[in-house]
Amino acid sequence: MERGIIGAIIGDVVGSRFEWENNRSTDFEFLTDVSKFTDDTVMTCAVADWLVNNDNLAEELRTWARKYPKAGYGGKFREWAFDKEVLPPYNSFGNGSAMRVSPVGFYATTFGEAMELAKQSAEVTHNHPEGIKGAQATACAIFLARAGRSKKEIKQEIEYWFGYDLDRKIDDIRTVYKFDASCQGSVPEAIIAFLESEDYESAIRLAISIGGDSDTIACITGGIASAFYGVPDELVEKVWKYLKEDVKYSIHVFNCICDSRVISGDMEAFGFEPNFDDAYEDDEWFDEDSEMSEEELKDLMDEIEEYEENRN
């Protein structure tokens, strides 16, 4: 079994052919000749490289977007990514912030770090509170799964911190769901698909059966399911053939960095009360009792950058 961002990427690849031709069933061929990676994968690699290299995130996103200009970006993001200058964030609450955030969940060593890095990963484009919230909920679900929390505990934590309604059932959602690319209209559904699943593959099948923005919903679900179950090696091997060399390299380097980081599942070490109605301050998600201060986080990122330079 393999755990990591490959789980999110597989969700994107499997869901790619259903984005505009929804399949409201869990019974479908998992991978076909027309399956491909999309903007979800490209942006996931950009965030992974940002975490590894401690680079400017806006430049990472723009660089990766320009490598793959036809990956299927939304209109506002395309305008932002391909402009000659780095434009300010455009107050989006679209699920683009959640689709690219899985590396944060696998990289973070504390719940608070997951919160802060998810916020940073979103706000360069998706600085609307719901856009930030969707990224944080996804990253924190992944972190909690990595920390060994049960599905019940993950559900309770996400409901508590983010206020999502996770009591619905996929069968009920499926009958009424319409295409919704907002965080608030797709992230809760993706999490519910994970909560109802039995293993990694069933999680992806449930996510796609919802309909709507299938590749992104499956990408979000896939990241969480990968952290919780792991991904079967044979499935990783199959999907590997759909990926370009730079995508594979990004995944490999990111995995090497994450393997050296020790996770802490101590929620009590990070006591804070989120308020998504208020403006975000740079240090809002850090308090004096947290396990990792902003300065310590910066020092850690500097160490990782030095490690990567020596490695090359």
How does the language model describe each region?
Residues M1-N312:
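Structured, active/binding-site neighborhoods that engage oxygen-rich ligands
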